[in-house]
């Protein structure tokens, strides 16, 4: 289960990197994508921490 979360985080990070490159010319869109990317990473980290710390 943990590896699935890691893969999801990697996929989200690479997808945001691709979209960031695509929208690089539009500054407002790029800022929005960066904010979204940061939120996604925070969410992934929190989910991973919760999963690791949770007794199964």
UniProtKB/Swiss-Prot annotation:
Primary site of residence: secreted
Sequence intervals crossing the membrane: none
UniProt GO MF annotations: nutrient reservoir activity
Keyword Secreted: yes
Subcellular location(s) of the protein: Secreted
Keywords: Secreted, Storage protein
Signal peptide: none
Tissues of expression: Expressed in fat body and ovary.
A single cellular component GO annotation: extracellular region
Keyword Ion transport listed: no
Role summary: Larval storage protein (LSP) which may serve as a store of amino acids for synthesis of adult proteins. The biosynthesis, accumulation and sequestration of storage protein-1 takes place during metamorphosis and saves energy for the non-feeding pupal stage. May also be essential for egg formation.
The family this protein is said to belong to: Belongs to the hemocyanin family.
Protein name, per record: Sex-specific storage protein 1
């Amino acid at each position: 289960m943990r590896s699935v979360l890691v893969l999801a985080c990697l996929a989200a990070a690479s997808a945001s990197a691709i979209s960031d490159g695509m929208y690089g010319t539009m500054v407002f869109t790029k800022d929005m994508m960066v904010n979204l990317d940061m939120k996604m990473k925070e969410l992934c980290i929190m989910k991973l921490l919760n999963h690791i710390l949770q007794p199964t």
